[in-house]
A protein has these predicted regions:
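Short loop/turn segments immediately following beta-strands, especially the blade-tip
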Residues: 29-43, 111, 146-156
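Beta-propeller blade signature
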Residues: 92-110, 147-152
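A detector of repeated loop/turn-to-beta-strand junctions in beta-rich toroidal repeat architectures
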Residues: 23, 96-98, 140
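Short, conserved, GDST-rich strand-edge loop motifs in beta-rich repeat architectures
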Residues: 79-96, 142-146
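Surface-exposed loop and turn segments in beta-propeller and other repeat-based domains
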Residues: 1-3, 38-62, 117-118
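Structural signature of eukaryotic scaffold interfaces centered on beta-propeller domains
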Residues: 2-13, 17-19, 62-73, 124-128
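Blade-level signature of beta-propeller repeat domains, shared across WD40, Kelch, NHL, RCC1
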Residues: 124-156
Length: 156
């Protein structure tokens, strides 16, 4: 049962990124002109806490939830990150919805960490302006707009 390995995947030019929903795992792959796929880097923000039973993977209660939203351009990768204990979602689904936005260089270095006022699952990077758009649905759905430079300057 590999449903625990679900997450978000986006591409930008010849690179694609994967961010795990249930673990703090983020990676980048590049695709060559010959269509060879090469792992460029991978990061694990925190070690997963799980049990492995033959072909099954089960998260333990003290495992921290991972990434929900993912977007990238030619310089940066942005993700919404939960970091909450996964068991909280069993009691209240929205308890693990991210309140942190992380920015990484395309080389995988953390370059910004921003505390969000509202829980936000989805993130989109504008193609035309240096802005990020986040969707939050706490009481009703709203789109919040952030300047990319503000996120990159932020350090929690």
């Amino acid at each position: 049962d590999f449903t625990q390995l679900q997450g978000e995947m986006v591409s930008y030019k010849n690179s694609f990124y994967f961010a795990s929903r249930f673990f703090g795992y983020l990676c980048r792959y590049d695709i060559s002109d010959e269509e060879d796929v090469t792992l460029k880097w991978e990061k694990m923000l925190v070690e997963p806490v799980c049990n492995v039973y033959e072909a099954n993977l089960a998260r333990k209660k003290n495992n921290l939830d991972g990434f929900y939203g993912l977007t990238a351009n030619d310089k940066y990768v942005f993700v919404t990150y939960s970091g909450e204990l996964c068991y909280k979602a069993f009691e209240n689904y929205s308890a693990c919805t991210p309140k942190t936005l992380l920015g990484f260089s395309i080389d995988g270095e953390l370059v910004g960490k921003y505390a969000l006022e509202h829980q936000s699952m989805s993130v989109l990077l504008s193609q035309y302006t240096p802005r990020l758009y986040l969707l939050n649905c706490e009481s009703e759905c709203n789109v919040e707009i952030f300047e990319m430079d503000d996120i990159l300057k932020a350090k929690l």
